[in-house]
Amino acid sequence: MSVRPDIATRPVHPATRGAVRRPTGLVAALNDPARASAIGLVLIGLAIALVVLKPWLPEALVRWPAALVVPFADALNRLFLFVKDDLGFLAVTRAGASGIEWLLDITANLLYGKRRWPNLEPIPWSAVAATAACLGWWLGGWRLALLGGGTFVWVALMGQWKWTMETMSVIVVAVPLAVGLGLALGVASWKSRRVERVLSPMLNIAQSLPHFAYMIPVVVFIGVGPKSGAIVTIIFAVPPMIRMTLLGLRQVPPEIVESGEMCGATRWQLLRHVRVPTARREILVGVNQVIMQSLAMVVLASFIGMPGLGQKLLQLLQSLKIGRSIEIGITIVLLAIMLDRLSKAWAQRQPAHFSRGTSWFARHRLLVIWALLMVGLYLLAQVVPLLAEISRKHAFSVSKPLDAVMDAFLTVVDPVTLAIRSFLIRDVLIPMRDAYLWLPTGAVLTLVAGVAWRVGGWRSALTCTGFVGSIALSGWWDRAMITAYMVSFAVLLASLVGLPLGVWAARDEGRANRVLLACDTMQTFPSFIYLIPVIMLFGVNDVAAIAAVVVFGLVPMTRYTIEGLRGVPPQLLEAADMSGATRRQTLWNVSLPMAVPTIMIGLNQTVMFSLFMVIIAAFIGTQDLGQEMQRALSSTDVGKGLVLGLCVAFMGLTVDHLIGRWGAERSRLLGLTS
């Protein structure tokens, strides 16, 4: 690129040397906060006017004309067909899937005796339980040992061993592959800004897409079954690993790196022996997220033929066998809690150090005990078959007592739940849905542009209007508005419960810790689990779907409210006390205003959780984007599924952008950030 000589040699005035160049002209006018606020108010007023004047508006402003709908789905289908058939990508994906299938055959053979290579006898359930107990003891003492071993004892006694091992055989393969891929991409993003710029928007969209959007392309390129479940699990679980790896490497103190350089370490040695070990905590948090995401997706992958606990739970829910469903649900919850606690303990565990001369046995005592247990239990299982496998006829079951208890409970609460359901459907949900569908498309777009302009200027307005406008262009506006009404009502209820609950819990340290522990536990549950109680209470309708969304979205609202209030600087609270403020005055005038940025992050997370859950809740009879996504999955319509998934992602990204910009500005005004 050439430079004009007169510009290159022109002297720079000393007063302007080093000064930051600021935008001038139209850009400066658009970025002016006062003017941006005024423009935003004008656009919001225009949106209200469009709503009032709807009967006189041209049809194009009321609904995007069908003739102008862009056939994104057809274009994507043609692209996928071209990639699959003309470029021969199908053969490549099937070849790659065969390698994963080979790994799955090994784990399936070892865990539940599937007749595949290496054709060995399955590991006895007692040996698996002992392994989990030893691992728990090594990571966190007797409590984790009891949790690990007890979980697998429960699974065996309930006769659910094969279904559980079908699920675990996929997790055992998917988690290491997702961790390795995420670690490699995270390191690549850290080393290259160009790679990070490419990956960052992809990760934003990937983490906003609902679960089902991942499944359809995998079914087209891979097929159905365990290998598809493993691949979709890997794809779904990789993004948090990339982000946590990047975060950890960026937070490595420079003085540690300088120490390595002074010792003559090469760039690879610095990465391998200095940076990655220093970022160990963040990387292991990423591993924890991969494990939990994998369990959530493996359960949902039953929709594409993945055998295991998810498939069994799906069958039982479809036949409304509540007692058996609760048994399977308890198993999934125990697995989730066990995997979460073990992986968190691993992330927090510090390497053990021994004095010079310590014997090998003393350093590896638990490993020796585990090996002896494995050999002993394997030999004992040859003599006592019940230690190898507990068949269904020898298994315990609490499904009949549970059914009896549930029947008695529902007999008592049915009049109440029926009244609640009838009131909500007749007086709240149907009018609210009709109101959302009545809104003109032009008014909604103008309102989004006005709010975004007021919050973040013209760039935010352009971004958010582009997101929402893409939904209108896709032709799925009405379904998106139904999704929006369900999510907004669920978020409102979750906020009305979660915010006061968080405020109440934050007033006492012990109470806050107990509520946060409950939030941690609930957050480990795969989202599918929340459908069991709501189907039991409300049946199959919008009320049940919204109830599941509310419970699922309650956790982040409560958690971030507590964290926000606990994060208020103590000197501010002391100043309020010295001024004679009561506890209520301190809460309303000091604590809550300072906690608002953190609470808004909780609101943002509640919206994202609700969007994910409302798509899953389509299984119990909604008429939103989730229902269409399930239809696309059943017909393997890749284009339609991706377009619907992007519509959901754009809704989430719009809310995320607005809340993020507002929260950042609020933090700046409060002096929390520069």
Regions found by a protein language model. Name each.
Residues 88-135, 419-451:
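Individual transmembrane alpha-helix segments
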Residues 175, 231, 235, 267-300, ...:
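Transmembrane alpha-helices
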Residues 241-287, 557-605, 629:
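Short cytoplasmic-facing helical segments at TM-TM junctions of multi-pass membrane proteins
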Residues 250, 281, 285, 326-384, ...:
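C-terminal transmembrane helix and the adjacent membrane-cytosol boundary/short C-terminal tail
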Residues 54-102, 384-424:
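Interfacial/capping segments of alpha-helical transmembrane domains
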Residues 220, 249, 292-335, 351, ...:
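Glycine-rich helix-loop "coupling/hinge" segments at transmembrane-helix boundaries
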Residues 170-173, 177-184, 190, 203-237, ...:
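Generic hydrophobic transmembrane alpha-helix motif, especially the helices
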